[in-house]
């Protein structure tokens, strides 16, 4: 008899789906459980406006359930932490904050995508955490490895836990637009690429772990690209290596149907949202994406 094809999961709009079995989760139950974690990571595609609205709404509920929160951002390198602190304390206008934090240099995506999150933190005096590292460190570790970088030049980071074979396959799938759970040749990505990617993963994890190392640790809500979060790889993996195990990963989707095998293990829950307007992609990045698509490569 021919093998029976797996039935795709159906995912209605405005609902949370459990990636393990395709059932629709009760929102109150899910977010109450998330509020008891040490860390909740809200994955994003940086250029999609509706995802940032979703992040804000989830953060609002989590803060209601557990007022002691901090919000960590991939967008900011550690060196601008004093500026984030000044913003939270009301010392800067919005324009002055964006200028002083060097937004156009450190990130480059339209600030309007993120401003509601920044204002949310300021309104509630919820600490904003700079999760990223000094950009040249990523290049240096990728090229030379951690051992070549003296400890005092590592921007406060410890070396990454070694990449698993599954993570190598995952990154190869992303980079070359192939199924994340398929049998992708891990050699398609170089050790240099893996080391660079893991430097970001480790930076986010180290800075989150540092925020938790206090007498009354907050619930840390992470605003991070989903490629650093999916399937337990990336930052969740590095957090576990640092002893932070109570980590939730919530992800958005615009798809109404999911392949069960591809979705399994991607995170704790996936929310189906709408996308009422197009992506907001920086011009230079749009040019890079167009060029990459010509070469049939994912960027």
Show the residue positions of the predicted features.
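Compositional signal for N-terminal targeting/processing segments
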Residues: 1-299
